[in-house]
UniProtKB/Swiss-Prot annotation:
Protein name: Transcriptional repressor NrdR
Region of interest (Disordered), residue spans: 1-22
Protein's gene: nrdR
Organism the protein comes from: Allorhizobium ampelinum (strain ATCC BAA-846 / DSM 112012 / S4) (Agrobacterium vitis (strain S4))
Family: Belongs to the NrdR family.
Cofactor note: Binds 1 zinc ion.
PANTHER family: TRANSCRIPTIONAL REPRESSOR NRDR
GO process annotations (BP): negative regulation of DNA-templated transcription
C-alpha cells in the first residue's frame, strides 16, 4: 500500500481488525520511511458495478457517494455512524448479489429511500424531496401523510 504522505511503496500493517458490521477489515499502517500512520479498509467486492444514470451516461459505482447521500440526509439527526454503515453495506451487498452489473440510479435511490424510512423519518423526507424532485409544498404533505399513516398503522392495537 502506497503511503499517502510520502508516496513510499513500503508500508507495514501494525493492526488489523474487523470493522463496521464485519463487512470490512480495518488496517492501521505505518510508513517506515516517513513515520506516517494511516488507516485502510479492505472489503469484499463480488462484482464491478456500473451505475446507469437517468441521462443514459454510465459511471462506476462509488460506495463513498452512497455513504455521502446518507450523511447529507441524516445531517444533524440522532443516527449512529454504525447504523449508516450497516445500511450502506446492506444496499451494496444486495446490489452485488443481484446478478446485474449495470444498476440504474433509480434502483439505488429506491433502496436508499427504503433504508432511510427505517432509520429516520426526517432524513427520509429530505432524501425523498431531492430524489422525487419535489417542487411544491403539497409534495411534502403527501409524503408526510404516508409516514403518519404508517406510524398509525404500526401502533394500532392488535
Amino acid at each position: 500500500m502506497r503511503c499517502p504522505f510520502c508516496g513510499s511503496d513500503d508500508t507495514q500493517v501494525k493492526d488489523s481488525r474487523p470493522a463496521e458490521d464485519n463487512s470490512a477489515i480495518r488496517r492501521r499502517r505505518i510508513c517506515p520511511d516517513c513515520g506516517g500512520r494511516f488507516t485502510t479498509f479492505e472489503r469484499v467486492q463480488l462484482r464491478e458495478l456500473t451505475v446507469l444514470k437517468k441521462t443514459g451516461r454510465k459511471a462506476p459505482f462509488d460506495r463513498n457517494k452512497l455513504v455521502r447521500s446518507f450523511e447529507i440526509a441524516l445531517r444533524k439527526r440522532p443516527v449512529d455512524r454504525d447504523r449508516i454503515e450497516r445500511a450502506v453495506s446492506g444496499i451494496v451487498r444486495r446490489l452485488e448479489s443481484s446478478g446485474e452489473t449495470e444498476i440504474s440510479s433509480e434502483q439505488i435511490g429506491l433502496q436508499v429511500l427504503e433504508a432511510l424510512k427505517s432509520l429516520d423519518d426526517v432524513a427520509f423526507v429530505r432524501y425523498a424531496s431531492v430524489y422525487r424532485d419535489f417542487s411544491h409544498a403539497e409534495d411534502f404533505e403527501q409524503v408526510i401523510s404516508e409516514i403518519t399513516a404508517k406510524i398509525s398503522q404500526d401502533h394500532e392495537p392488535g
